[in-house]
């Protein structure tokens, strides 16, 4: 498949979105909550009719979870320079526990805002940021623990259920909603769509088993949940580097990622104009945005880890919190005493954040300042409702290093920090590996659930083998499906370029689709209510040779259509009862249909006679020769 060129400007990107973003045979619909401004998006995939001897039978539309935001709504005009609608602004203002600041609190933020050299790069439609009023806590966990159901929680309940309970009484959906029993492996999943209530969401947030990453300054956000008892989510990474790229390219990567199904995005920029790049992404993102603040703090030192200070890092946290970043990866578990444990590893410390903090600890022979200042970090987090993504700085970089003392020592420290964050009512998820062979994955999940008190687990794969450079989206997708079933709440995607180079748009697409497959497989295995609906619809379309429906119900309709058309490009092939794999004479599904038609055409007497012979055969012991 040809690779698409990146957008040259915001104007060309907007034009491209208007022309190419729409999904085939789909409509954008909304579920309305208890108030008119709770409008939860979902995508409905339209199906063609089934042709029978008795005429055409309608096939119902299939609702699917949608991460694409307003970009897939034909009624919304996209203006990247103005940003997306502020869907949460009224909810936040009505709570009365925040205040609009007179200006930016971060020294670095003020410097960037007043620097004439970056004026042409800045997002022009900025408003002053909000912060909690003195003594207030504005986290979703704090509200949940006070018994308050926020609009964000109600939004999540509708989004997770897709209102599937309304379909169970409709005859058209009866067969499509059949589902194999799952094995939730001890998780407390809702049994039916109607069990996914706002109160259920509140309880999960209050317990710490789930988070709603939703900074009060990211008003464009469409709320979503990350937790063991919800749908498995996936994260996509983007970010510029010293050798790439433009602001428009990074916004394009974000939009491209959510088009294919990324539930959250991490901006891992390490190149020029990190601050401005992040602002453009946030103002145009309907999904939560995460960052690794130590990257930008290191950039401020000129790349010298030893020169990092708590004061510099604190200013970076505030700068990013006031922009609207929803979760921070913070490597507070990389303790001085753990660093020597990595000495005998094959690949040492492979986390960028982990290596930065390890180098700082060794250079100063002091404890990690992220650990010693953790309570102060919590004060910042709860003032803006930024969630922790506690980083696994000592994750294994190869399967030989998996499950060692350094990895699990850090994990136990992350559990200690989770308990500390929860005392502040700050939301937490835990980052996990990495590279782990299949037989050692369950131990990772068990350790996390035990020592981190069921806080959501967020893993990078894991890759289950190290022998396939160029195919690590597959080696990691195998591990991701397994650990997702075992209880991981969010899977960080891996692209084919992992370990080899910076991914382009097509690599991002490949990684996201791979991880959508893994997450969906995990939902099926867990028994998420309604998870099998799309599988059943596609299987029925496949058996009935409804080729267009097969394409459109898939995760990547364009890829499926292009593969089919490579050998059978004619339009007539879209209604043919065969494909190029078996041809017209050897198609098993076509033969099965012919057998069914033949059986249905037999007189009742003939059918009865065959049934009698069948019974006689069984009574004789099912022996062909006596």
From Swiss-Prot:
One BP term from GO: thiamine diphosphate biosynthetic process
Quaternary structure annotation from Swiss-Prot or TrEMBL: Homodimer.
Enzyme class: lyase
Functional note: Catalyzes the synthesis of the hydroxymethylpyrimidine phosphate (HMP-P) moiety of thiamine from aminoimidazole ribotide (AIR) in a radical S-adenosyl-L-methionine (SAM)-dependent reaction.
GO CC terms of this entry: cytosol
Family to which this protein belongs: Belongs to the ThiC family.
Binding residue positions for substrate: 237, 266, 295, 331, 351-353, 392-395, 431, 458
Listed cofactors: [4Fe-4S] cluster
A molecular-function term among this protein's GO annotations: zinc ion binding
Record protein name field: Phosphomethylpyrimidine synthase
Swiss-Prot/TrEMBL catalytic activity: 5-amino-1-(5-phospho-beta-D-ribosyl)imidazole + S-adenosyl-L-methionine = 4-amino-2-methyl-5-(phosphooxymethyl)pyrimidine + CO + 5'-deoxyadenosine + formate + L-methionine + 3 H(+)
Binding site for [4Fe-4S] cluster: 579, 582, 587
Record note on cofactor: Binds 1 [4Fe-4S] cluster per subunit. The cluster is coordinated with 3 cysteines and an exchangeable S-adenosyl-L-methionine.
Keywords, sorted A to Z: 4Fe-4S, Iron, Iron-sulfur, Lyase, Metal-binding, S-adenosyl-L-methionine, Thiamine biosynthesis, Zinc
InterPro entries: ThiC, ThiC-associated_dom, ThiC/Bza_core_dom, ThiC/BzaA/B
EC number: 4.1.99.17
Pathway(s) served: Cofactor biosynthesis; thiamine diphosphate biosynthesis
Name of a matching Pfam family: ThiC-associated
Binding site for Zn(2+): 435, 499
Protein source organism: Cupriavidus necator (strain ATCC 17699 / DSM 428 / KCTC 22496 / NCIMB 10442 / H16 / Stanier 337) (Ralstonia eutropha)
